[in-house]
Amino acid sequence: RKEPVTAGLILLNILVFLIVEFTGSSQNTMHMLDCGAAFTPMIIQGGEYYRLFTCMFLHFGIEHLLNNMLVLFVLGSRLEQVIGKIKFLLIYLIGGVLGNVISLLIELRTQDFAVSAGASGAVFAVMGAMIYIVIRNKDGWVICL
C-alpha cells in the first residue's frame, strides 16, 4: 500500500471503537470518559493532559467514526502520497491535539464544558494541509481524488 499511515490510522480508530463497544458503549458518556475522552475539568484540575491525545481515537457512535474515517481515507490517502508518511502523521497528530487544545481554551473561556471525542480536529488539519497545497500550487498541480 502506498498510504500506510492513512491505513494504519483508520485501522487504529476502528480497533479502538470496537474495544470501546465490547467493553461498554461509545454512546455512554461515563464509559467514554473511562476510555480517555476529553473533559476540560478533568484535564485542567485533574492534570489528565493525555486526554488531549487519547480523545482523538474515540468516537461517539458508528456514524461519527464512519464520517471521520471516510474523509480521512479520501483526503488522507492523497495527502500522504504528496507529502510523505512522516509529514502526514505529524500534521494529523499535531493538528488533532491543537484542535483539542483550542476546544479546551474555548470551554475555559465560556465555562461551558462538554465531554468530547473524535478525530475531527485531526481530519480538519488534513483538510487544511490539502487546501494549502492546492493554493500554493494552483498553477501547476491538480489533485486527482
Predicted regions and their residues:
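A detector for small-residue-rich transmembrane helices and their helix-helix packing motifs
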Residues: 1-145
